[in-house]
Amino acid sequence: MSSSTEHPTPAAVRFRVAAYDDPQSVRFVDALQQFYRERYGGADRTPVRPDEFAPPYGLFLLGDLPDEPGTAVCCGGWRRHDTASIASADAGILRAGDAEVKRMWVDPAHRRRGLARAVLAELEATAQRAGCLRIVLETGDQQPEATALYVAAGYQRIPSFGVYRAEAGSDCFARDLAEGSFPGAPVRRASSSGG
């Protein structure tokens, strides 16, 4: 048995665009919300709408392994902020044109294989191609593994924003998406057949 079969590299993941309300997306979002309930005692209260993750306003991706096409093992999305979507309390923190990462998740059976970094790299690359200049995200102090990923990927802490801006334990990060400013994991993209 080859080690690449047992532990696929991030380069082996194939990303495809999916609707936020696609059944496979919903399965992952539900699993993520359950994770939040276990770690924080409740689901994420950040309001999201499926249309925020549809081009050109954003993007939602599912990642498949080559030996399991059509069966997602990870996901993530980003939504673009404009002046109308930035709450007055977040002015000066968020900028028009920022891409906000939301709903990043790797199936527990496929963790510790670099897939979270691959999802993050693909979200960065797609946001940059869509003209976003910066990527922002929020995590919490009960997710040290997420914080470690973002710091290792070159993200810098910024003041808290969003519904948790005034709560202790809200950790927010940003990274510029200037041309060539981040190393993306090599990824093969599956052809999009809608969805």
Region locations from a protein language model:
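Active-site acidic-Proline motif in GNAT/NAT acetyltransferases
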Residues: 107-109, 113, 141
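Accessory recognition modules or surfaces
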Residues: 117, 169-178
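Acetyl-CoA-dependent GNAT
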Residues: 10-102, 107-108, 120-122, 126, ...
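Conserved catalytic-core motifs of GNAT/GCN5-like acyltransferases
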Residues: 20, 136-141, 147, 151-172
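Residues forming the Rossmann-fold NAD(P)(H) cofactor-binding site
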Residues: 113, 117, 121
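Conserved GNAT acetyl-CoA-binding A-motif
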Residues: 120, 127-139
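Charged, amphipathic alpha-helical coiled-coil/dimerization segments
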Residues: 113, 125, 134-136, 151
